[in-house]
Amino acid sequence: MSVNINYLLLIPEILVLSLGILLFVLALITPRNLQKGIGYLTTIGLLGIFLYMPIAWKHTGMAIEGMYQVDKVAIFFKALSLLAGVFVTAIAPRYMEKIGYYSEFFVFAVFAVLGMMILVSATDFLTLYLGLELMTITFIILAAYRRDSAIGAEAGIKYLILAGVSSAILLYGLSLFYGLTRTLNIVDIAAIVTNNGISPAFVLAMVFVLAGFAFKISAVPFHMWAPDVYQGAPTPVTAFLATGSKAASFAIFFRFFYLAFPGIREHWVGLLATLAALTMVVGNLVAIPQTNLKRMLAYSSIAQAGYILVGFLATDFTGFKAIMFYLSVYLIATIGAFTVVTVYENVTGKEEIRDFAGLSQRSPIMAAVLVVSLLSMAGIPPLAGFAGKFYLFYPIIKNWGWLALLALIMSMVSVYYYLRVVLVVYRDEPEDQTPITLPNSIYFTLLITMAVTIVLGVYPTPLAKIAQQAAMIFMK
């Protein structure tokens, strides 16, 4: 049986795969003392592919018949994955030089991006699982990248075991769906459900799949891996997990549930509301006593997943628009915060909140970016996070008023632990007065993330229009 393949629609994936193979070959043949350029080549390569995405936006359709859909939602999330890859590889070189094993990091980072891109276009169980496992396996390797560190090894082992368990749960759910429907295509499931209804076994399969996806987005109660892995992994990897991986996982989450189960929304929407409420509450409350900044940001990331889940409860395309907009501004703010943590940890070897005392005196730009990023995550106007939360919470007020109120309260709670960091950075005196010098790649990353966070807060319309255009296509 022949399969129709539209290679024009696969150009971004082909380019990323080619870049990964090129880097792999260069890592093998280039002497260690000459491998510094591999990091910069990775950033430039991913940036070039990202700049191609406006062209890709104009070309949509089924790339691989019945298995791989390239629509505007997929292109949007591929652009986010590439953007996360650009920023992470831009901030990683000096950090990886200090760890050692320099070039391998960039090879795995590129293949992680490829896994994300495959995942967000999947409309078939096989492509879904292929993309998910490519992304997961590369992140397992990256999480354990500090092989000489006990906490790094612990992070890798925990992620390996728990990711394996979650993948097994997801695969079992998918196998149940196949046994019940005799199809691997996500869209075909919707037609079968409409004609035949659902059975207890179907509900069980849905729960297994939901649990598997909930692990990937670190939703409560499947979040326990996140704090330990975020703290133990190299900081650029933590940034990548918190942004690119989370965005891609949310993309396939809502693609799966809204394509496969649109006619039985009432059976799963209440479960998602409960999941969102638990995730917001646990993430924010447990973040309060944290003393390690990376660990605090891990719980903050869990809470952010709860806010994003709220967008699933909207009854029209505004929920999709809100999810895409918020994931974009969350990605930018999170990259900004983790860039500061990466540089500071690389200079001082410290990542406790108290260790950032007086950062404003040592590096005003780092302090400003950290504060702007944290306040944006808290939803403080006029920053981008405020606009994002407005888009998320407003559509659900009518039908889910209690959840919108809870989300608002939890956002106010988050201000407390974010402001703790702000006070340490600006109020306390530093132990070391030595100014922190920044390489150009770091400096530009800091400036870009801060500028975009401020501009999108004041003028969110351009990004909101792009998200709305993609969301309306998806609803069709």
UniProtKB/Swiss-Prot annotation:
It is an enzyme of class 7 (translocase). One of its GO terms (biological process) is ATP synthesis coupled electron transport. NDH-1 shuttles electrons from NADH, via FMN and iron-sulfur (Fe-S) centers, to quinones in the respiratory chain. The immediate electron acceptor for the enzyme in this species is believed to be a menaquinone. Couples the redox reaction to proton translocation (for every two electrons transferred, four hydrogen ions are translocated across the cytoplasmic membrane), and thus conserves the redox energy in a proton gradient. The lineage of its organism: Bacteria, Bacillati, Bacillota, Clostridia, Thermoanaerobacterales. NDH-1 is composed of 14 different subunits. Subunits NuoA, H, J, K, L, M, N constitute the membrane sector of the complex. This is NADH-quinone oxidoreductase subunit N. GO terms for cellular component: plasma membrane. Signal peptide: none annotated. It is found in: Cell membrane. InterPro entries: NADH-Q_OxRdtase_suN/2, ND/Mrp_TM. Its EC number is 7.1.1.-. One of its GO terms (molecular function) is NADH dehydrogenase (ubiquinone) activity. Belongs to the complex I subunit 2 family. Pfam families: Proton_antipo_M (PF00361). It is a multi-pass membrane protein. It comes from the Bacteria. Keywords: Cell membrane, Membrane, NAD, Quinone, Translocase, Transmembrane, Transmembrane helix, Transport. It catalyses: a quinone + NADH + 5 H(+)(in) = a quinol + NAD(+) + 4 H(+)(out).
